[in-house]
Amino acid sequence: MERWSGVLRVPLHPNSRTFHRVGASLCLSPETRTLLVPKANAIFFCGDRVEGTGNPVIERLSNLQNLSEIIVSKFGSFTNAWVIEASAFNGPFAVYKDFIPSVNQYGEPSSYHPNGFPASTSTVSLLSNCLEEVRSVLPTPLHYMAKKVILGTQVDTKSGLSPSCSFSRSKTFILGFSKGGAVLNQIVTELGFSDIGSNANSPDVGQLMGRKFAGSEEIYVVPKTKEDLLNSISEIHYVDVGLNSAGAYLTNHDVFERISKRLMQGASELRFILHGTPRQWSDKRRDWIRNEKDKMLRLLESEAPKSGGKFKVLERFYFTDKPPSMQMHFEIIESLDAS
């Protein structure tokens, strides 16, 4: 699979004064080197910056381009990877203000509310702006090639067909690393309060495209609306998340009850995977992280049996025989078992 890879600097809104750095690794057509609809979009939210350690492992696993390539290796070559940094930092502390309005000056959330759906709306806007930026740097002759572009999806103007290796209705995998887990909590909250939508029982995304585009059948490289995003989420990965305050894991039972109800009403199946290391789960100075994780796991497991097998929950503990360290906190990304 041909790919376009790079690190983008894009605003969330056209008139925004702040920018997000986003590492991207995207599927390209081997024939035309134009963007393809992927089997899935894997969206990875980074945490605080860790600088000046002199540790080559931490530095390598803090590099957005490296991270995007690792994410592709975990989910497969037909996956687009998006590695998102916060737009604002207070020293080393990531502040995802546009995604979680309740955060303080250090990026720590006081609560998670669905009002306005800020995380899903911001994610859709950011990915759309990223695509526009990528399209602007693709070579012009290769970018157009007598094709019609629908947010980067190439459609033959004579046959109306997409390339044979494009996929219909891409799935979305959401990953939150360290403080990036707070963005996951906000997205999960919004998911619980969202409508199922028209694509809940859509054909499997693995089905190869071979049909004409007509109105509602248009497909997109990334979700076009917050509803499209939320309804496309099939996996949620908490990757060694933690905060210096409460709120590292979501412990609102009502949210998980609502998600379970969505699944019973026809939403596509959903997997939660909690990945951790001794760095976070065995930290005695921040014992609330382990307590919140255990509570969230119990809540998820209590709801899973109600969905007829559509709600799956997994817990994976890494480096259990090693003492806690900052290096293992980053190494979990490379060791991640996403199966």
Regions found by a protein language model. Give the residues of each.
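Serine-dependent carboxylesterase/thioesterase catalytic core
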Residues: L138-E269, R279-S282
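Short coil/turn segments at secondary-structure boundaries
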Residues: N55-E59, A94-F99, Q186-E190, A248-D254, ...
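Phosphate/oxyanion-binding active-site loops and adjacent basic polyanion-contact surfaces
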Residues: R60-N63, H113-E132, K179-V183, E292, ...
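Short, surface-exposed "cap/lid" segments of acyl-processing enzymes
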Residues: V7-V103
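Structural alpha-beta junctions
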Residues: S68-W82, S232, R262-F272, L297-V313
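Conserved beta-strand elements of beta-rich interaction domains across eukaryotes
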Residues: G47-E51, S87-N90, K179-G180, G242-N244, ...
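Intrinsically disordered, low-complexity, Ser/Thr/Glu/Asp/Lys/Arg-enriched terminal regions and linkers
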Residues: P92-L142
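C-terminal catalytic histidine-bearing segment of alpha/beta-hydrolase fold enzymes
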Residues: W4-S16, H20-S29, I273-S339
